[in-house]
């Protein structure tokens, strides 16, 4: 096998000249494949005497191993070069500024709710919540609202059946609280409520917050003082506030509260009154011992007045151009 060393040398040269993995594979097939030059050397062993064949076979196998080692080394080099070239193409320019992540902001109605909760929390009020699917007793009967009252009509209320409805006010939370807790009581009840109405100033779902105090010797003076302080804090100015006599089935006497707008006109902002004795009796509280006041206000209404929004529906349209103004 005088030319075995020559084959190995040629194989090494071909391996070094291979410029990619595909070309290297062709070299492997040419020398080590089933019909490769070095593989065919094994067929020449039959021409040798039997005693020389083991030594000759060992020489051929060593030559094949040397070529295989050279192939492996060259393959590693080529694969590393290909990987580095690919990484170079995919290199991230770290000097390029990243995309700015825009922070979100609270919805204007949420801002209003948080602001009001903070104010009344400092006065010792607790925040309580209740079910949005309510029964007619807690939504109407316990609040001294008779069966013939217009609020019970289908065109004003979303009914599920004869006794279950989407609550029209958060007053039911007050009833549930008074059923479970004896005075003194000092709570506010924010939440979603539902009315069958939709126009520029009304939506089928809106947010309401009601407040309640029940204790001994609570008077209308306490009610007026509390709401005066609240409105001046909320609007951040020394507003003119007036109380107009009104009617609500669950309070007596009742009033609606107006503030003087910048245009010189009175603007209604909330309703209030002294808790009706029948409401206290319905929850097992003696009206001869305890008295209380309640108030209720629409969160969208107050938000519109605070920020000068003219169309209530804008709060529910998810228009970022509108919402970004309140960040």
UniProtKB/Swiss-Prot annotation:
CDD domains: PheRS_alpha_core (cd00496). Belongs to the class-II aminoacyl-tRNA synthetase family. Phe-tRNA synthetase alpha subunit type 1 subfamily. Its EC number is 6.1.1.20. PANTHER family: PHENYLALANINE--TRNA LIGASE, MITOCHONDRIAL, PHENYLALANYL-TRNA SYNTHETASE. This is Phenylalanine--tRNA ligase alpha subunit. Keywords: Aminoacyl-tRNA synthetase, ATP-binding, Cytoplasm, Ligase, Magnesium, Metal-binding, Nucleotide-binding, Protein biosynthesis. Signal peptide: none annotated. The lineage of its organism: Bacteria, Pseudomonadati, Pseudomonadota, Gammaproteobacteria, Enterobacterales. It catalyses: tRNA(Phe) + L-phenylalanine + ATP = L-phenylalanyl-tRNA(Phe) + AMP + diphosphate + H(+). NCBIfam families: pheS. It is an enzyme of class 6 (ligase).
């Amino acid at each position: 096998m005088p030319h075995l060393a020559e084959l190995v040398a040629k194989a090494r040269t071909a391996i070094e000249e291979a410029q990619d993995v595909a070309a290297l594979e062709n070299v492997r097939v040419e020398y080590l494949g089933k019909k490769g030059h070095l593989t065919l050397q094994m067929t020449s062993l039959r021409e040798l005497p039997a005693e020389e064949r083991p030594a000759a076979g060992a020489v051929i196998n060593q030559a094949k191993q040397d070529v295989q080692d050279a192939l492996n080394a060259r393959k590693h080099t080529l694969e590393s070069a290909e990987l580095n070239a690919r990484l170079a193409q995919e290199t991230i320019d770290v000097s390029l500024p990243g995309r700015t992540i825009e922070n979100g902001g609270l919805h204007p109605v949420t801002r209003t709710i948080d602001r009001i909760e903070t104010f009344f929390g400092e006065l010792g009020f607790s925040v309580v919540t209740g079910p949005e699917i309510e029964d007619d007793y807690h939504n109407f009967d316990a609040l001294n609202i008779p069966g013939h009252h217009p609020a019970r009509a289908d065109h004003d209320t979303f009914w599920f059946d004869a006794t279950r409805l989407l609550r029209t006010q958060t007053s039911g939370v007050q009833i549930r609280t008074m059923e479970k807790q004896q005075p003194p009581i000092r709570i506010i009840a924010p939440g979603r409520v539902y009315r069958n109405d939709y126009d520029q100033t009304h939506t089928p779902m809106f947010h309401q917050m009601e407040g309640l105090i029940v204790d001994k010797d609570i008077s209308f003076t306490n009610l007026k003082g509390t709401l005066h302080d609240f409105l001046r804090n909320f609007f951040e100015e020394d507003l003119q506030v007036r109380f107009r006599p009104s009617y609500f089935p669950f309070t007596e006497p009742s009033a609606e509260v107006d503030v003087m707008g910048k245009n010189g006109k009175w603007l209604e902002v909330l309703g209030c009154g002294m808790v009706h004795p029948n409401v206290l009796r319905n929850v097992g509280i003696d009206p001869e011992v305890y008295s209380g006041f309640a108030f209720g206000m629409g969160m969208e209404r107050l938000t519109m007045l605070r920020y000068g929004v003219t169309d209530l529906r804008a709060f529910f349209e998810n228009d970022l151009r509108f919402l970004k103004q309140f960040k």
